[in-house]
Amino acid sequence: MEKRPLAGKVALVAGGTRGGGRGIAVQLGVAGATVYVSGRSSGSAGSDLGRAETIEETAALVDAAGGTGIAVRADHGDPDQVRALVDRIAADRDGRLDVLVDSVWGGDPLTDWEHPLWEQDLDRGLRLLRRAVETHVITSRFALPLMVARESGLVVEVTDGNTARYRGSFFYDLAKSAVIRLAFAQAAELRPHGVAALAITPGFLRSEAVLDHLGVTEENWRDGAVKDPHFAYSESPAYLGRAVAALAADPDVMAKSGRALATWGLYGEYGFTDVDGTQPDFAAHWADALVDEYGPLGDPL
């Protein structure tokens, strides 16, 4: 891959505040892109998640990586705010948007891992769907016209898992499966206009929240395997980011449109590594250590 294959390209990473979204934004910056980073957690106003990370921090990391980071606070559940965000990009960049990444989530505090549907709080579950699915629909509704007008671009829907395996909680499973279907449906409608759309999942992602939960940092993350042995096979957000940057730089990415992809299925093709030079493959670890307990991952959707 060229050193800066995305120089001159414009990207929007919705939900780029932390985790996979931040990792993707930074790696798009490494590849030379101008990256608009949007979300609710800003230096001027936080979100109900109560996390310390901000969109401004992510934008600064994009700058430090060699790209251009632009933070724009927006609640992607509010159509007016998303419309204003896209209008700003159009005005700033002469209508150009090459990459749309939708990594909006915010569902961790709403996920009930203990109860079946009939025992769950309905309002809480529906709020999860609004955050995790409706936000993606709203974002694409306003951003896609920029790509369609130029007859080029890539839409990336970030999810969890790329198969039909049940994900352990009704509303969580519904949200993550729906995001894959969003990519499939967008691919069908965008194909005549030369725009690709796909879904992508990381493996066991070392997000800030996961690191906090295990009481470690990115510097000593391996110590987290004491509490969770499977964490030894985790991957950093940069690994997901490098996968997306490789896809965005691939002139033949249209061949992957409509598919549900994974970091473990792409590192061999594109040759990217994690920050420590390794190439984590969580599907291989699953087959070795988890399949007897949880069943096979299944074939990609």
Which positions does each model-derived feature cover?
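C-terminal helical subdomain
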Residues: 199, 219-301
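A short helix-coil junction within the Rossmann-fold of NAD(P)-dependent oxidoreductases
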Residues: 92-94, 107-112, 142-151, 250
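Catalytic loop of short-chain dehydrogenase/reductase
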Residues: 106-110, 118-124, 128, 154-192, ...
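A glycine/serine/threonine-rich, flexible loop-to-helix segment
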Residues: 50-51, 115, 192, 204-230, ...
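Active-site loop of short-chain dehydrogenase/reductase
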Residues: 9, 67-68, 95-97, 146-161, ...
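Short-chain dehydrogenase/reductase
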Residues: 1-95, 105-116, 297, 301
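Rossmann-fold scaffold of SDR-type NAD(P)-dependent oxidoreductases
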Residues: 14, 97-109, 132, 157-159, ...
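Amphipathic alpha-helical dimer-interface segment in Rossmann-like NAD(P)H-dependent oxidoreductases
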Residues: 105, 127-149, 163, 187-188
